[in-house]
A protein has these predicted regions:
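A short, Trp-centered hydrophobic/proline-enriched beta-strand micro-motif
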Residues: 60-63, 113, 133-145
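A gly/ser-rich beta-alpha-beta helix-loop segment of oxidoreductase catalytic cores
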Residues: 138-159
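Glycine-rich phosphate/cofactor-binding loops in nucleotide/flavin-utilizing enzymes
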Residues: 2-14, 19, 23, 320-364
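A glycine-rich, basic-preceded beta-loop-alpha segment at the flavin cofactor/substrate interface
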Residues: 225-260, 267-280, 291-296
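Amphipathic, small/basic residue-rich leader segments at the start of a protein or domain
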Residues: 1-108, 277-280, 295-303, 361-364
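A short core secondary-structure module
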Residues: 170-207
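C-terminal hydrophobic structural anchor segments
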Residues: 293-329
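Flexible, small-/acidic-enriched active-site or ligand-binding loops
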Residues: 203-237
């Protein structure tokens, strides 16, 4: 039986066509991105294809023809989340636009370390960590775990022992993790739904087993490494400022800066003739860059920002993937670099999984 909507000029107008599965699957992403403005149609279509591709068995079984409800606005006011690295970050982003990411990657990552220090370290931790960095040590931020992406399967575990913790470490794919330095290591702790983070100082880090992992990226600038071993850490070396979700807040704070850097790098590659941007790709790049800029300039943090930023990283990932698989990127090294950044600070599957888990179907 056909349905019709209103009468127009004496003739019934067909009802709007029902959404297909790809469009329905994309709603947990699109609803979050719409807070930044109207999406270009090409980007929306790209994200619909990606969402359908990323449906796992459980998601597909649970999928219905019902649309997802738009997320409700938070009843809590955003919290100020100011740090002292904004001006430096903006300066480096301008240099990336002119010269590409490779020559500015290390100083850009150092601003991330300073953001983490200023937002989530106690005053005593901050003073000691800054002194450590100022004396020539670099920070290794170790999140990816040999046990996989799910916290419950992590092999890196912090076990209470005496008046501190025994930290059993099995981390993979850490930037420069094979080199000496200090580290912030994310670990599973018994009974917690969030990972905990611990400061590991240079003399402790030097005792761990470290190995190279794969070829370097970004013109030899980025080398990954794996880390294993055990260290004892004091209670004072556990990150507590910011609450149990401190790591989530940190990633939500720095991800938009990373997305801005990636979009600036895409623009630079285009200027160098190493990447082609058609009208749809240009519109998608501009939307993502503008959205990321808007997020970095708010200076606040709200619970819903976690999902807004995950959607932004998802969009960035899918644009980079699209550029590579469509043949728009000329060189193998550039292709590999861009795909690597789709895995950094949130893969598409991880972003989509969390966005979908937070979404709810419309109730009849």
């Amino acid at each position: 039986m056909h349905t019709h909507s209103t009468i127009v000029d004496g003739a019934p107008m067909p009802a709007a066509q029902a959404l297909g599965l790809p469009e329905l699957a994309a709603q947990p992403v699109l609803h979050r991105l719409q807070c930044y403005g109207e999406l270009p149609s090409g980007l929306a279509a790209m994200l619909a294809r990606a969402s359908a591709r990323l449906l796992d068995s459980d998601m597909l079984i649970r999928q219905t023809a019902q649309p997802f409800a738009a997320p409700e606005a938070s009843a809590h006011a955003p919290m100020p989340l100011e740090h002292h690295e904004h001006a430096l970050s903006e300066s480096i982003l301008g240099q990336i636009r002119l010269e590409g990411l490779a020559p500015h990657y290390k100083p850009f990552m150092r601003t991330f370390a300073r953001i983490l220090f200023s937002l989530f370290l106690t005053p005593d931790q901050y003073d000691r960590a800054c002194a450590c960095i100022d004396s020539g040590n670099n920070l290794r931020f170790l999140m990816s775990d040999a046990g996989g992406p799910t916290l419950g399967s992590w092999r890196t575990v912090a076990e209470p022992k005496d008046d501190g913790f025994k930290l059993r470490i099995d981390k993979v794919w850490g930037m420069y993790a094979n080199l000496d330095g200090m580290a912030i290591i994310a670990a599973r702790t018994p009974g917690s739904f969030f990972p905990s983070a611990f400061l590991v100082w240079p003399e402790q880090y030097a005792t761990l087993q470290r190995s190279l992992c794969g070829d370097s990226f970004l013109d030899g600038v980025v080398q990954l490494g794996n880390v294993r071993g055990e260290v004892s850490v004091a209670p004072a070396d556990r990150l507590k400022a910011g609450g149990p979700a401190a790591l989530n807040k940190y990633l939500t704070t720095v991800r938009p800066f990373l997305v801005r850097a990636l979009m600036a790098h895409v623009e630079w590659l285009h200027d160098q003739g190493r990447l082609r941007l058609g009208p749809d790709e240009r519109a998608a790049r501009d939307f993502i860059a503008d959205a990321a800029r808007a997020k970095t300039q708010t200076g606040t943090y709200a619970n819903e920002d976690v999902h807004k930023v995950l959607a932004l990283k998802f969009a960035s990932n899918e644009l980079l993937l699209h550029l590579v698989v469509s043949g728009a990127v000329e060189r193998y090294a550039d292709q590999r670099d861009l795909l690597a950044f789709t895995k950094m600070e949130g893969s598409s599957y991880r972003c989509y999984h969390e966005l979908r888990a937070a979404a709810r179907f419309v109730q009849n």
